[in-house]
UniProtKB/Swiss-Prot annotation:
It is found in: Secreted. Keywords: Cleavage on pair of basic residues, Glycoprotein, Growth factor, Secreted, Signal. This is Neurotrophin-3. SUPFAM superfamilies: Cystine-knot cytokines (SSF57501). Transmembrane segments: none annotated. InterPro entries: Cystine-knot_cytokine, Nerve_growth_factor-like, Nerve_growth_factor-rel, NTF3_N. It comes from Calabaria reinhardtii (Calabar boa). GO terms for biological process: cell surface receptor protein tyrosine kinase signaling pathway; modulation of chemical synaptic transmission; negative regulation of neuron apoptotic process; nerve development; nerve growth factor signaling pathway; neuron projection morphogenesis. SMART domains: NGF (SM00140). GO terms for cellular component: axon; dendrite; extracellular space; synaptic vesicle. GO terms for molecular function: growth factor activity; nerve growth factor receptor binding. Residues 1-3 form the signal peptide. Residues 4-119 form a propeptide. Belongs to the NGF-beta family.
Length: 165
């Protein structure tokens, strides 16, 4: 699989998850070959472990050649996944003609990551603050009645008793 940088649409989480699931099933996720499966009498799939001899043969072959086995990707798998367009990765059957451009080095805004502008809200927010008393610029301590936010006359309690009476 070759990857190149592209600026195409964005991926939804569901489409990316199904694509990763397809890669895992195809055995190309993290260069792993899928485990062999067998069906039991009741139709359930079970994983068949490799014998010790098979595991040693695969391990010695990899060390003898000096590299991990390469998993071939079927072109049909790539054709099925064309709908997964990512702004960063493109699955392609062809080798890229040139290295990907370095977008981050060209953008001057990214070079100075410490300079950030603060967002300021316009005006002072008074959400959740309601006045029970008449509007005055000083504390009112001698009032026995007031007008609430709905315009009703209410009695101001001078003392609030809490606990058992």
């Amino acid at each position: 699989i070759q990857s190149t940088s592209m600026d195409q649409g964005s991926l939804t989480e569901d489409s990316m998850n199904s694509f990763i699931r397809t890669l895992i099933q195809a055995g190309i996720w993290k260069n792993k070959v899928p485990k062999q499966t067998a069906r039991t009498k009741d139709g359930m799939q079970t994983t068949v472990k490799r014998t010790k001899a098979e595991a040693e043969a695969v391990a010695s072959e990899g060390t003898r050649l000096g590299f991990q086995p390469v998993v071939l990707v079927d072109a049909e798998l790539l054709r099925q996944q064309r709908r997964f367009s990512s702004p960063r990765v493109l699955l392609s059957e062809n080798t890229p003609l040139e290295p990907p451009p370095l977008y981050l080095m060209e953008e001057p805004a990214v070079l100075n990551r410490t300079s950030r502008r603060k967002r300021y809200a316009e005006g002072k927010s008074h959400r959740g603050e309601y006045s029970v008393c008449d509007s005055e610029s000083r504390w009112v301590t001698d009032k026995s009645s007031a007008v609430d936010i709905r315009g009703h006359q209410v009695t101001v309690l001078g003392e609030i008793r809490m606990g058992p009476s």
